From Swiss-Prot:
InterPro entries: DUF1600 (IPR011631). Keywords: Cell membrane, Membrane, Transmembrane, Transmembrane helix. It is found in: Cell membrane. GO terms for cellular component: plasma membrane. The chain crosses the membrane at residues 22-42, 90-110, 150-170, 185-205, 232-252. This is Uncharacterized protein MG133 homolog. The lineage of its organism: Bacteria, Bacillati, Mycoplasmatota, Mycoplasmoidales, Mycoplasmoidaceae. It comes from Mycoplasma pneumoniae (strain ATCC 29342 / M129 / Subtype 1) (Mycoplasmoides pneumoniae). It comes from the Bacteria.
Length: 266
């Protein structure tokens, strides 16, 4: 009974704009997770490859950063007094991961539109994030249109809605426990990107779909560390840019949202 009352209180006793926005973003986050699961299942069925539920789908930074953001929103809805939300570090980290996703995928889209990067037909059906079709293009084919919708949703629509929540959240509550130590924040926030970078660089050596000339890599040619020695020239700067983004968000957060407000600590 107490849990039921608490749930009703959560949904109907709205304190501020942040709470109102949360009512929209929470189901939107569930839909976000549904889009990823549906895309992975479609990939499995279309290619008759059960392992694609992970490979090319949930092992991409796009899926993982969107999952982290959605889970953070749902956790905050259910357990906003959790110690993880005593300061803004968790939301700031999730926002950083999504910023990275948005920037680099849309740079890839721009490179495709301008013709700077061309992807061969043979990658179709193997890489959900790098396909032979032009990103965000709708042709009337249900399969390719779903891929385009999922790309648009995961790289533009949901990140924009999450960034809107972050802005309202920071503006409403500001710093309940200010983040003074940049190094400590980067160390904690950088754990996940570091682990992911390790996975990205090592998975081509695991002999997954390895024919002696090519093997599975999450982003095809761009992350093929086994058969493409030039990968290291751009992978190191890209990895460093993740920390640059986190640093920028830390500075912006402390600069504009550092003072406590009348809302105080929840």
């Amino acid at each position: 009974m107490k849990k039921t009352i608490g749930l009703a209180y959560r949904f109907f006793y709205l304190n501020n704009n942040c709470d109102f926005y949360l009512l929209f973003l929470a189901p939107f986050s569930l839909f976000n997770l549904g889009v990823m699961v549906a895309s992975a299942v479609i990939s499995v069925v279309y290619n008759n490859q059960p392992q694609l539920i992970w490979f090319t789908n949930f092992d991409t930074f796009t899926y993982q950063s969107n999952t982290i953001a959605a889970v953070c929103v749902l956790m905050y809805l259910c357990k906003r007094r959790c110690k993880l939300f005593d300061n803004n570090a968790l939301f700031l980290s999730a926002a950083g991961y999504l910023v990275f996703t948005v920037i680099f995928f849309n740079l890839y889209v721009l490179s495709r539109v301008t013709g700077f990067v061309n992807v061969e037909e043979h990658v179709k059906g193997w890489f959900s994030t790098i396909t032979s079709e032009m990103p965000y293009s709708f042709s009337g084919n249900p399969l390719t249109d779903w891929i385009s919708f999922a790309q648009l949703f995961l790289h533009v629509i949901y990140p924009a809605s999450f960034f809107g929540f972050i802005w309202i959240f920071f503006k409403t509550y500001k710093m309940r426990e200010p983040l003074h130590e940049l190094g400590k924040f980067l160390l904690k926030a950088g754990v996940y990107p570091s682990l992911y970078a390790f996975y990205l660089q090592t998975v081509p050596f695991l002999k997954i779909w390895d024919n002696g000339h090519d093997s599975y890599s999450v982003y095809g040619f761009f992350s093929q560390t086994k058969y493409n020695s030039y990968v290291w020239f751009w992978s190191i700067p890209i990895f460093a840019s993740m920390f640059l983004i986190l640093w920028g968000l830390f500075v912006i957060n402390n600069r504009y949202y550092g003072a406590k407000t009348k809302y105080g600590k929840q």
